[in-house]
């Protein structure tokens, strides 16, 4: 997990995560509320979007803010370090996905951070099946193959769910400046 995933700005000024080697983007979801809590109980919150890939979930804030002595603009959750993930569907309020992610040994001594992604606008009819399938593959230690990613572009679209399915992979424009 990382508070500083590599980001770049597209032509419209929107920040996107750079893809890792052999990583494919599956979906993007805007209007997300994100929260994570460190082992020493520092809380980081933001509003923005998530990117779901074959390797990780990345939250990117609409704008970075100073929180707990740090500049917080993004948070990366590698699927292989994710545990205790669950879908929360309260009677009142917005649905969310939450869980734990193991920190690197250099950061917080390898302890767990808790995280929560709240879907503040719209349903979860597209995000949830993709998330559950990724978790199933991870638990079985299966590689996520290209056919799974390609099958997502045939998903049924819920008009109440503003999720964007990637049909083509986002590319870093030649003129884009990498942000940190």
Which stretches of residues belong to each language-model region?
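Anionic N-terminal interaction surfaces
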Residues: 1-51, 121
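Surface loops and adjacent helix of pleckstrin homology
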Residues: 29-30, 37, 55, 62-64, ...
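Acidic, Ser/Thr- and proline-rich intrinsically disordered linker/docking segments
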Residues: 2-7, 11-13, 44-45, 71-180
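Conserved beta-hairpin
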Residues: 43-67, 71
């Amino acid at each position: 997990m990382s508070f500083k995933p590599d980001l770049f700005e597209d032509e419209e000024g929107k920040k996107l995560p750079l893809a890792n080697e052999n990583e494919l983007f599956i979906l993007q979801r805007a209007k997300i509320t994100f929260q994570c809590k460190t082992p020493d109980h520092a809380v980081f919150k933001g509003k923005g979007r998530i990117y779901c890939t074959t390797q990780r979930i990345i939250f990117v804030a609409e704008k970075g803010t100073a929180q707990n002595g740090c500049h917080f603009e993004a948070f990366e959750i590698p699927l292989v370090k994710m545990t205790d993930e669950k879908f929360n569907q309260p009677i009142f309020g917005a649905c969310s996905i939450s869980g734990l992610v193991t920190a690197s040994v250099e950061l917080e001594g390898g302890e767990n951070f808790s995280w929560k992604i709240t879907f503040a606008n719209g349903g979860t009819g597209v995000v949830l099946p993709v998330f559950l399938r990724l978790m199933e593959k991870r638990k079985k230690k299966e590689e996520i193959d290209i056919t799974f990613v390609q099958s997502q572009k045939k998903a049924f679209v819920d008009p109440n769910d503003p999720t964007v399915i990637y049909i083509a992979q986002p590319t870093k424009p030649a003129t884009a400046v990498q942000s940190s």
